[in-house]
């Protein structure tokens, strides 16, 4: 007597489970990178909102604004978002700091900067890892926080990967 086989064998089920596991293992890191990049984009958006005030101050006074107040923008703790702790202006450098919680763990507490340089009668802006500007000689250098304070380059958009010495 022949009986018809109904359903799946144990081997077939194990193969399906293995395939689903492999797909999940590939998709999860890609999704985490995607969420980190989306959260970093909020920091860039908030920081870019300060560019016009900083540029205007520089063009009117010939020096970079020393802080948020002199730039004519809200205090650093008032410029925040869902993923951004603060946006600070210091010697014309706009630095956004990510929150230390409720953010992708790879970017928690990390920073990115927007800074400008005078070139051929205009002001050119750059975006990248955190930098500082020496107010006396107007030089821009990499922030001394080390790698702990830097957002990994893979989480920065391609338009925000300038080196501190870019021109």
UniProtKB/Swiss-Prot annotation:
GO biological process: cell adhesion
Protein known as: Type IV major pilin protein PilE
Job description of the protein: Major component of the type IV pilus (T4P) that plays a role in cellular adherence, microcolony formation, resistance to neutrophil mediated killing, twitching motility as well as transformation. Mediates the attachment and the formation of bacterial microcolonies on host epithelial cells. Mechanistically, pili retractation induces host NF-kappa-B activation in infected cells, which is temporally associated with the formation of gonococcal microcolonies.
Modified residues (N-methylphenylalanine): 8
Pfam families given in the database record: N_methyl, Pilin
Keyword DNA-binding: no
Bilayer topology: Single-pass membrane protein
GO CC, alphabetical: membrane; pilus
Principal location: other
Family annotation (PROSITE patterns): PROKAR_NTER_METHYL
Lineage: Bacteria, Pseudomonadati, Pseudomonadota, Betaproteobacteria, Neisseriales
Residues annotated as transmembrane: 8-28
Protein's cellular compartments: Fimbrium; Membrane
Keyword Transmembrane helix: yes
Positions of the propeptide segment: 1-7
Gene3D superfamilies tied to this protein: Glycoprotein, Type 4 Pilin (3.30.700.10)
Known glycosylation sites: 70
Family: Belongs to the N-Me-Phe pilin family.
Domain of life: Bacteria
Quaternary structure and interacting proteins, as annotated: The pili are polar flexible filaments of about 5.4 nanometers diameter and 2.5 micrometers average length; they consist of only a single polypeptide chain arranged in a helical configuration of five subunits per turn in the assembled pilus.
Keyword terms, alphabetized: Cell adhesion, Disulfide bond, Fimbrium, Glycoprotein, Membrane, Methylation, Transmembrane, Transmembrane helix
Gene: pilE
Disulfide pairings: 127-160
